[in-house]
C-alpha cells in the first residue's frame, strides 16, 4: 500500500505569506501549481495576491503581477495603504506589475510572452474573469513557447476569433504550466454565490481552489480551501480579518 502521507510530505511547497493559511495546507502551495482564488468584490483577493508575492520577494524570488482590472499604479498604492510596500522590490527588479488591455487582440500573446520569457518564480493574474468573457484572437500562436497539444482544433485558422470559454482558460493555464512558476489566478464572484468561479470551468483546470466570502450582515469574512492537489486539508471555512499587513486567519 502506498503511504499517501509520506508522498505528500515530500512535496516542495511555496509559502503563501498569509498568517495561518500555510498551517492548513501542509506548509504552503505545491510548487509549480496554479491556484484559483475566487470571491466577491472586497473579499481580499488582490490582498492575498500581494502577500503571496511579497513572501517571494523576501526570498529573492522573481515575481510578476498581471492585472486586467486596475492600472498598476493603483494596485501599488492600494498595497502600500495596507503596509505592503512594493516600491523597493520594483526598483531592485524583483517584481514587475503589468497592466493588460483586454481591448487589444494581442493581449493573449503579450501575456504568454511575459510569463514565459523572464523565468518568474511566482506569477499572479488578477483577474481571469475579463479574459474568460471576451472573444479570443490567436495570431502567430506557433511563435509562443507553450504546449499546444489539443489547445486549438486543427480546422481553426490562426486569424479566427474563437468565442470558446474553455479555450480561453486552457490557453492561460497552459502558459502558466509551461513557465514552471507557482501562480495564483483570481476570479470574481457575486456576493453570496456558491460557485467556485465566474466561468464554471477554471476550478477544474486549476490545481487548487481557495474561496473568499463576505457576510455583510454579520460583518465577517471567511476563507475556505476547496481543493488543493496532493494536500490534506479541511473544507471548513476559516474566519479571517484584513488589517495592516493583509489577511490573517483567526
Model-derived features: positions:
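Pre-Walker A adenine-sensing motif
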Residues: 16-28
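Short hydrophobic/aromatic beta-strand immediately N-terminal to the Walker A/P-loop
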Residues: 35-38
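Phosphate-binding/switch region of NTP-binding enzymes
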Residues: 177, 182-245
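Loop/turn-to-beta-strand initiation segments
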Residues: 62, 94, 119-122, 178-186
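Conserved P-loop
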Residues: 40-106
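Phosphate-binding/switch loop-helix module in NTP-utilizing enzymes
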Residues: 100-177
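Conserved P-loop NTPase
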Residues: 1-6, 10-12, 116-118, 122, ...
